[in-house]
Amino acid sequence: MHRVDYHPAPHLTGGHLLGTDSKGADIAAYLFGGLQVNIKAALIYLPIVYSIGLTLGMFMGYFGGKADLLTQRIIEVFSQLPFLFVVMIMADFVPLHLRGMFLILVLLSMFGWMHITYLVRTATMKEKTREYVAAARIMGAGPFHILARHILPNLTGIVVTLLPFSIAAVVLSLASLDYLGFGLPDTYAGWGRLLNDGLSKLSSPWVVSSAFCALVITLMLVTFIGEAVREAVDPRRHTYYE
């Protein structure tokens, strides 16, 4: 089907608060749709990467041994790969009509769990030397009971601290893939796609500025909200902005 390009209308024109893009779509509505996509993506992405990262990290830190060393080597190899290019190559092999949100997020999740695993592993190694873990062992608690009932609750601070960075990572990754044309189909509202549209038509600066501001404001809000939640969970460690 031949694509019809329109001249983007500026803001406050024809009832469009932020104007329109080259396809005649209302930018404000498109940004709101992109926000919904990012929220849905985060709700899918976060459980996947944190389930993998927490499980592997706790097992590596608690049991150690050859399995720990092997997993570390695997993580080191994968962490050296430019994950965005790998995801682009893998996504390019998938037909566009099959390239849905879940598939893209699974591809991103293949790399998103590794830094979580390392931090959880280090924290678990520290926690397993605590007196409460030794007391649980004396009372006959098994390793899985100790991990689930004693060590996992003490990892809450790490999880809360990492959450805003994980959300920012998935938002930026989706925007980058959409900008490069390897992201979600056109049926999804993508801020990266809007950014690409704006950069290709710099004579209409409100298009690119709207997408850029949406990304910056969202990432700043995620960071500050995450910091506030972290301070509420762990008030002993405060970060002050001057």
Regions found by a protein language model. Give the residues of each.
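Short alpha-helical transmembrane interface motifs in multi-pass membrane proteins
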Residues: 37-41, 56, 68-72, 100-106, ...
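Transmembrane alpha-helical segments in multi-pass inner-membrane proteins
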Residues: 96-103, 166-169, 186, 190-217
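Amphipathic cytosolic juxtamembrane alpha-helices at the membrane-cytosol interface
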Residues: 25-40, 64-72, 125, 129, ...
